[in-house]
A protein has these predicted regions:
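Catalytic-core segments of enzymes that bind and process phosphorylated/nucleotide-bearing substrates
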Residues: 1-206
Length: 206
């Protein structure tokens, strides 16, 4: 919470069924339009909420129009002198950077081509990202997929789909190679092209 990023609320709870104790459960906040309403007081028809799930990108609320426009702008104008200023009109840059840093720090390899939710207020709002489902973090499943879940993975390469990461797409031990094949670059293109801009690089580094 102190980082100023949106995240899925979580609370361990004791679970009872018909008065009989069943065990400890993880009670989690939904990351749909209810999340935005309960945290920001905005109704479903006031927001765009985008979901990236495995091979699919969809609008949970509103449309994809503003998101697609933002991605197109980043891909085509990252070298412009006013890029950072224009980007700041489309997204909450500091929140996006903090989201990136957190996901990379925990080595969440089930992301960014999966488990990604992005939202904005339609009227004058900027896109924000929601942290959720980081169970692949910290090399938790390293034994299941050594290359893909290695806690020493270069997450900058992984997140941008460059370097050695592109070679893992053909590895039988890579459970998530879909993030790096040629037809799936749309999943990493936003961060990749943002990082081609010096002003964004500087902000990310500081």
């Amino acid at each position: 919470k102190e980082l100023g990023i949106d995240y899925q609320g979580y609370q361990p709870v004791a679970y009872y069924l018909n008065g009989k104790y069943q065990g400890l459960m993880g009670l989690r906040e939904r990351t749909n339009d209810d999340f935005v309403f309960h945290n920001y007081g905005l109704e479903e028809d006031e927001i765009d909420l985008v979901s990236i799930k495995t091979e699919n990108i969809s609008a949970v609320a509103g449309t994809l129009d503003a998101y697609n426009e933002m991605v197109s702008y980043v891909e085509n104008h990252y070298a412009d002198s006013d890029f950072y200023e224009q980007l700041s009109q489309r997204m909450d840059i500091d929140e996006y950077i903090r989201w990136q840093i957190l996901e990379q720090f925990v080595v969440n390899t089930d992301w960014p081509g999966n488990n990604t939710k992005i939202w904005r207020k339609k009227k004058g709002g900027k896109f924000r990202w929601i942290v959720y489902d980081t169970d692949f973090g910290y090399g938790m499943y390293e034994g299941w997929s050594p290359n893909y879940c290695d806690a020493s993975l270069n997450m900058m390469d992984f997140t941008m789909g460059v370097g050695d990461a592109v070679n893992w797409a053909n590895g039988s031990s890579n459970g998530g190679g879909y993030q790096f094949d040629e037809k799936s670059k749309w999943k990493t293109t936003l961060f990749y092209h943002c990082m081609q801009n010096e002003d964004f690089q500087l902000r990310f580094a500081t």
